[in-house]
Amino acid sequence: MKVKIKKLVENAIIPTYAKDGDAGMDLTATSKTYDEHGNVVYGTGIAIEIPKGYVGLVFPRSSICKTDLLLTNSVGVIDSGYRGEIMAKFTYMHMHNKKYEIGDRIAQLIIMPYPTIEFEEVDELSETERGEGGYGSSGK
């Protein structure tokens, strides 16, 4: 599937798969700023045109465990109508460990289809083995 991409800055890097069979394409930082709360905002210098019926999801890379960073919205959602720069905002858990710099791969992008959902209000839901069991209900 082809997706249109626009470089917004000269040093932008087109996302690629690191290895054959990977689901996520690496996003690379081209800018680094801080918001009013001290969170670090990385720009990728790219904008994409996601087809209707698809969504872009921005996840932290697995190597984030080597940093003190936490993606502030857990998973970024890029709707098909968005045409702005893809960015990732992180909060610092501690101030004394590795942080990402410009040129580092900061996150990963997955583009996937999604169904359009229409809710049907009912009085009862079907029975299941789990039922209403929530947190911890499946055991240790």
Identify the function of each model-found stretch:
Residues 1-140:
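DUTPase catalytic domain/fold
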